[in-house]
Design a protein with these regions (language model features):
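Mature catalytic domains of secreted/periplasmic carbohydrate-active enzymes
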Residues: 25-223
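C-terminal motif of bacterial Sec signal peptides marking the signal peptidase cleavage site
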Residues: 19-21
Length: 223
């Protein structure tokens, strides 16, 4: 079969286009605007998890405890953290965060740095550790575990001083090192205000931007 000059040119053009298409390399896309880091992407992929506010406030019916509550008021006799974890798992949640310490300063674990904790409550005859029970329940059901730790402590007499920051970080270190992997840490309520403060019953304000030295605290969390 003979081809005319025009037909030959058309065939040649098609071949050249095909070769060009096969050998072209697409340039990588350039991001427009801020790009999420690995921590932000991991958080986004969680999609759905529980935040449980369970602490002394559960028994005093207060949104914020004043700090003068007695450990004897905390006695959840029917507590079953495995039920919490099971329901969370069945609901499609991927993790649980618990208020390990709210603004009233009461600790759900037997912190060695304060007497204002479950170790002086009637629950489990003073031998309970709700943080441990819940962290183990989360592990059993394949859930991530996180903690909320209030920077503001209306119970501690040293709040507002440098001494308190050492106390706060000591408690944070306990939570980060004694209960397995912690996927998220919440800090909330850092302004200060009125409180019991070991019996002082006064108002204490702090500079929330400088008092806590957040960069150092955040570095502790990310180690």
């Amino acid at each position: 079969m003979k081809f005319s000059v025009k037909q030959k040119l058309n065939i040649l053009s098609i071949l050249l286009i095909s070769i060009s298409s096969c050998t072209s390399v697409e340039e990588p896309l350039t991001a427009v605007g801020p790009v999420p880091n690995e921590y932000q992407l991991a958080w986004q992929e969680l999609e759905y998890y529980a935040f449980i506010h369970f602490n002394m406030n559960t028994f005093t019916n207060k949104e914020w405890g004043y700090g003068d509550e007695q450990p004897s008021q905390f006695n959840p006799t029917e507590l079953d953290t495995r039920q919490w974890a099971r329901v969370a798992k069945e609901s499609g949640m991927k993790g649980i965060i618990i208020t390990a310490k709210h603004h009233d300063g009461f600790c759900l674990w037997p912190s060695k740095f304060t007497e204002h904790s479950v170790k002086n409550s009637p629950w489990r005859e003073g031998k309970g550790d709700l943080i441990r029970e819940l962290s183990e329940a989360c592990k059993e059901y394949g859930l991530k575990f996180g903690v909320y730790l209030s920077p503001w402590d209306r119970n501690h007499p040293a709040y507002g001083s440098a001494e308190y920051i050492t106390y706060f970080r000591n408690q944070l270190r306990e939570l980060l090192t004694q209960y397995g992997d912690i996927f998220e840490v919440w800090f909330d309520g850092a302004n200060g205000g009125d409180g019991y403060y070991g019996g002082a019953n006064e108002e204490r304000r702090v500079d929330k931007k400088s008092y806590y030295d957040w960069p150092t605290t955040i570095e502790m969390v990310r180690r």
